[in-house]
Amino acid sequence: MIRHSTSTQVAAPLGAYLQVTKPGIIMGNLIAVVGGFLLAARGEVDAVLMLATLVGLSLVVASGCAINNYIDRDIDAKMQRTCRRATVTGAIPLKQVLGLGIALGVLGFGLLAWFTNLAALLFAAFGYLVYVGLYSLYMKRNSVYGTLVGSLSGAVPPVVGYCAVTGRMDGAALILLAMFSLWQMPHSYAIAIFRFKDYEAANIPVLPVAQGVEKAKLHIVFYIALFALVSTLLPLAGYTGVGFMAVSCVTSFWWLLMALKGYRSDVNLLRWSRQVFGFSILTIAILSLTMALDFQVAGQAPLLAMLG
């Protein structure tokens, strides 16, 4: 007779609950939050505020992911990548998934409300409502512009980190919002290309499925080029230094070259889209780290003024 230890019995459901919150997405967002927070802190870090911001926003993101899993259970069942999720297999009762999402949201927003400020709280709420309400409930299923709308919510974490320190929306916060929104587009389109059959099976109108892979290639190149230009605004406006400018130009240029390879006649579409996707993650992680380290202290002239 096979015996199962108590630890094994507990680990399985705990693992299922953890997967519902999409820990990979949480970790990716944490890197962006740290970048925005340290950019604003300019070397004067409030450890308690930073910890509260990271934990609070992580809980908010986890809440959004759990509720997204609850909403998407019907389309997840049609996709090979997602058909084994707990909301599809029944590993966790749907009421518990919804309850978990609500509880995490209450805790996350509570922490942000108590420790941060109104600007950070409002941006977190904006991102949450766009992701759960507008994107998950409607745009993802019904519009080719779902990716564009969803990109706004994906760009919120670094802005929340920044505003947690400054308490206001300023030029740097706007640049971060634009920069991370633009990054989301080629990142998401690349996923949609190498997961084309999944999205097609679930009847999700992402650009490659709705309007063709060739148009998606064009959009990938366009958004990477625009992302590269917007990224230079941080050093040009004096929020970061020459180091960030150099790293931004190198990574963006390499990413753009990689995207242009999609037009080669002998391109392996699956491999190419995975490369564009993989380098997108590396790019945003490197830039988040660089902005955290290459901030400009008060009183230093903007790079644009130095060039002039």
Swiss-Prot record:
GO terms for biological process: heme O biosynthetic process. It is found in: Cell inner membrane. It catalyses: heme b + (2E,6E)-farnesyl diphosphate + H2O = Fe(II)-heme o + diphosphate. One of its GO terms (molecular function) is protoheme IX farnesyltransferase activity. The chain crosses the membrane at residues 20-40, 47-67, 92-114, 118-137, 144-164, 174-194, 218-238, 240-260, 275-295. It is an enzyme of class 2 (transferase). CDD domains: PT_UbiA_Cox10 (cd13957). Keywords: Cell inner membrane, Cell membrane, Heme biosynthesis, Membrane, Transferase, Transmembrane, Transmembrane helix. One of its GO terms (cellular component) is plasma membrane. It is a multi-pass membrane protein. Carbon 2 of the heme B porphyrin ring is defined according to the Fischer nomenclature. HAMAP family: CyoE_CtaB. Belongs to the UbiA prenyltransferase family. Protoheme IX farnesyltransferase subfamily. Converts heme B (protoheme IX) to heme O by substitution of the vinyl group on carbon 2 of heme B porphyrin ring with a hydroxyethyl farnesyl side group. This is Protoheme IX farnesyltransferase 2. It comes from Shewanella loihica (strain ATCC BAA-1088 / PV-4).
